[in-house]
Structure formats: C-alpha cells, structure tokens
UniProtKB/Swiss-Prot annotation:
It catalyses: L-cysteine + L-glutamate + ATP = gamma-L-glutamyl-L-cysteine + ADP + phosphate + H(+). It holds the Pfam family GCS2. This is Putative glutamate--cysteine ligase 2. Its EC number is 6.3.2.2. One of its GO terms (molecular function) is glutamate-cysteine ligase activity.
Length: 384
C-alpha cells in the first residue's frame, strides 16, 4: 500500500469559505443518468475564474468547487458562475445537470468508473460500493487559523451534523421508489469502513498520531480515505463539513455555507462545552433520525438525558447564530433556512410533491434540472 504523508496544517484566514457540489449529469431524452463526464470535461473551455470543474468517481457525476472566499456573497458568485459555465457546455452536448442527493431511478450496475488511478483503486478496493457511490453531496470548507483550532472545530461541528442533514435533505427516492427517508444518500456513504464521526481527538498532535496509526495498520493511505462526517483538511487549512445532500438550487447551497460560517464564528466565540465522549454514544442514532425524519427527527441529548425535536433545535440554532451572521454580512442568506424550518418545507418535500403530481420520476428529474439551471419554472413555489 502506498501511503501519503499527512503534511503540515496550512493555516487559513478565519472563517474563509469554500464549497464543493457534486452534480448529476442526466440525459435530455429520459432524464436518467448519462455517462458524459469525461467527454464533457475534455471539451470544456474554461479559465477557472470561478473555481474548478472536475471528475468524480463515475461518469455520471461532475464536481464544481469554488475559489476560497472571505464572504458568502463571494461563494454565491462563484457557484453561479460555475453553474452557468457548466450549463452552457452541457447544452452543447445535450446533457442536463441536476441537484439532489440521489438520482431517483438510476440503475447502479450501469455506472462506469471514471479513468484515473485513485478512482480505479477505489473500485478495486470496494467493488460494487464504488458504483453505488454515485450519490451527490455538498461539502463546505471553513478556514481555521491553526491546526488545534481545526481539531476543536471538527469536534464541535459534530454535534450539529443532524442540523445540516435535515436542512439539506434532498434524496427521498432510491432505485425508483420512495425510501421514506428525507436523506437516503448517507446510507450509501455509511457502507464505507472509515465513514462516520471523527474519533474524540483533542489536539492536532492526537489527530496526527491517530492517522499515523491507521496508516501503519494498512487501513488508510491518505486523508481522502477518511469519509468522516466532518474532517480537517490540512492542505487547505480548513474543516470540511461533508454530510449535506447537494441541494436543488445554488441559492440553497449558499445558505448552507452561510450557516456553516456563522456557526463556526459562534462556536469559536462562545466555546461551549463539547461533551465529546457522551456525544459519541448518540451520534449514530441522531444521524439516523435526521436522515429518516428530517425536521421531524427527535434528537437524543446525552447531557440532559432527554430527546428534543430537531425542529426546535434548528430554530434555536438559527437564532443563536444570528448575531454572528450579521457580523459576517450573511444574515440574509439564513432567511430561507428559517422559513424552511418554520414552514416544514425543503427539497425532499419538493421532490415528493412533483412525483405526486406527475406520477413518474422522469418528469421529477426534468423539473429538478430546470430548477438547478436557474430556468423559470412554474413549480418553483415552496411546497408544504
């Protein structure tokens, strides 16, 4: 096994931001997934002014990633530019792009692994799981000023994993049927052996020792093998939140980035006790609750030994970070999240409403593709 050294943590500007979105490539004929990623990227004439457009593990996916930004408005501008650039090139190739955490009806054995040593290694190592990993997430990077701060923030964000899952949930359909989940995507991620929560590590030194142990045991080659819900990213100088489904719009993706930035500031400003060891006992259950029930989840509190409605927790969270959002000049971006919680709306509900209207999932994907691409659509009203 060839291992890659962890390297030093590259300090970043406090609360700087970056966003990655994994997007679906769909056929304009039947809106099933298509296999055009390599050809699309090969024909792309783009100067990377807004960030990167790159391959993901299968030919039915494409990833866009913003430039590092100091503001949420900068993230919004990059995502809009990336989306518009990709849309223009996709239209020339008769391909649609679409958000959502899962494609509602694709058949995973039909997926083709993208060329590249890492992708091939993943396929050889994990077999069919690599093709089933054709799911689509949003990752948010938050800049940290030191390595120890990054580890503390990784642990602190872990408590809020259910909040980000519920607010981003957009994967109710799997294999052509309603999964009854709000976010079914994370079930595909959970199959990998190094998924889940970061262990209770208290410093960068403890993290480097833990990672060296995993390498020595032959478990991990590089930090990319850690599919944790939240993980440090030393080469970027960030903490990366990895549990969000790809939303149906770039506006929603931007709102989630605003919450991550505001929450990071609030956490580092107030330094609440983390109770990391106790939280570890309930993390998996709380994650399931958020995936299955979304805003209706009941979250277990290992400190007060009770359960709390996630909807109330979300409302309290959005209120708690409001001062920090104002200081970061991103308060307006939190308004859609507050409205979604208050009205019990979201992308999963929108997708189910479209399926209920049409009675088929092809038209659901067609409308979802329009929604991501920013085209006028009579069905873009909020769904209760």
């Amino acid at each position: 096994m060839t291992t890659k050294a962890l390297g030093d943590f590259k300090d970043s500007a406090a609360f700087s931001l970056g966003v990655e979105l994994e997007l679906q490539l769909v056929s304009k004929r039947d809106f099933d997934l298509t296999r055009g990623a390599t050809d699309l990227l090969g024909s792309l004439d783009y100067d990377e002014r807004f960030g990167e457009i790159k391959l993901e593990i299968t030919e039915s996916m494409i990833e866009i990633s913003t430039q590092p930004q100091s503001t949420v408005d900068g993230i919004a501008a990059d995502l809009s530019g990336l989306r518009d650039t990709l849309r223009q090139h996709c239209e020339r190739n008769n391909i649609g792009i679409c958000g959502g955490g899962t494609h509602p009806f694709h058949h995973w054995p039909e997926r083709r692994i993208c060329p590249g040593d890492r992708f091939n290694d993943l396929y050889q190592r994990y077999g069919y799981l690599a093709k089933q990993f054709t799911v689509f997430g949003q990752h948010v990077h938050i800049g940290c000023t030191s390595a120890d701060e990054a580890i503390w923030l990784t642990q602190a964000f872990g408590v809020y994993v259910p909040a980000f899952i519920a607010l981003s949930a957009s994967s109710p359909f799997v294999d052509g049927v309603d999964s009854f989940y709000q976010s079914a995507r994370l079930n595909a991620v959970s199959a990998f052996p190094l998924s889940g929560q970061c262990p209770p590590l208290g410093s960068w030194q403890e993290f480097t020792e833990h990672f060296a142990f995993l390498q020595a045991c032959g478990i991990a080659q590089s930090i990319k093998d850690l599919y944790w819900d939240v993980r440090p990213k030393p080469e970027f100088g960030t903490v990366e939140i990895r549990v969000c489904d790809t939303p149906l719009t770039i506006e929603q993706a931007t709102s989630l980035a605003a919450l991550a930035q505001s929450l990071a500031r609030w956490l580092l400003r107030t330094r609440p006790p983390l109770h990391t060891a106790k939280q570890a006992h309930v993390a998996r259950y709380n994650k399931f609750q958020a995936c299955r029930y979304g805003f209706e989840a009941m979250i277990s509190d290992p400190v007060n030994l009770c359960q709390t409605p996630l909807k109330q927790t979300l409302a309290d969270l959005l209120e708690a970070v409001s001062e920090d959002a104002r200081e970061l000049d991103c308060a307006d971006w939190l308004s859609p999240l507050k409205q979604a919680v208050a009205e019990n709306t979201g992308d999963a509900a929108w997708l189910r409403a479209r399926e209920n209207q049409h009675g088929n999932l092809n038209d659901v994907v067609r409308e979802a593709s329009k929604r991501l691409m920013g085209k006028n659509d009579q069905f873009q009203e909020k769904t209760k």
